Amino acid sequence: MMCGAPSATQPATAETQHIADQVRSQLEEKENKKFPVFKAVSFKSQVVAGTNYFIKVHVGDEEFVHLRVFQSLPHENKPLTLSNYQTNKAKHDELTYF
């Protein structure tokens, strides 16, 4: 993977779900709602001064959200940050940089 270029979309892994779970409360607070389902479906990653994860998450019914989560470099010892998100996404919507 080139530094700065997002990876190809991949199926979500247990690690991806763990990352999504760690920022779930940040999203629920910003949206002022609790999601009955929060299942990571797919993701892309981008190496920067740390890693950006773009994660498609199923949040119930036919509703999806796209998350951009930043993970700092290991030596910085900082928590994951929900950098940005997009709501009202569908299952077929492609993960893109936002």
UniProtKB/Swiss-Prot annotation:
Molecular function per GO: cysteine-type endopeptidase inhibitor activity; protease binding
Keywords assigned: Acetylation, Cytoplasm, Nucleus, Protease inhibitor, Thiol protease inhibitor
Motif (Secondary area of contact): 46-50
CDD domains for the chain: CY
One record GO biological process: adult locomotory behavior
Main localization (coarse): cytoplasm
SMART domains: CY
Key word Lyase present: no
Subcellular location as annotated: Cytoplasm; Nucleus
Gene Ontology cellular component list: cytosol; extracellular space; nucleolus
Disulfide bonds: none
UniProt family annotation: Belongs to the cystatin family.
Subunit (UniProt): Able to form dimers stabilized by noncovalent forces.
Protein name, per record: Cystatin-B
Species, as recorded: Pan troglodytes
